[in-house]
Amino acid sequence: MAMNALNPRIRVIWVVRSLIGALILGGAAGGIAVYRSASLTIPASLTVLFVALGVGHAILRYRSWQYVVGDDALYLERGVLTQVRTEVPLVRIQHVDSRRSAVERLVGLASTVVYTAGSRGADVTIPGLTPDDASDLRQRLKGLAIDAG
């Protein structure tokens, strides 16, 4: 089975989130430096480091994310530092949603959320899909779950 990759635009979302986090941490470090009348060299260096780590993580995260719908289950592989392989048996799927946050809409993406029997929340979210791909995946999983059940 060939695994499916996410849409490359998901990297934009992940990089922007990393940049926001880096700017918040760098701004806090800069604020402390200004308050203590210290040099801004360390906060600036930390901000650059956080940006580089965030961008690197987003790229590696994109490369590690894959999924495929098999005959009996949905298979996912993801993770940068900790690699996670998930298998969701089709007979356990209760319902499937397509979701588009405001940020996803800005870059033309959507997510598919798979809920399984006996869970309190969303068991699996597949981000970085085009709206059409998310809808197609939702319909396909729904049909396969009905057939499996």
Label each residue range with its predicted role.
Residues 1-149:
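N-terminal basic, Ser/Thr-rich segments that initiate or prime the first beta/alpha elements at protein or domain
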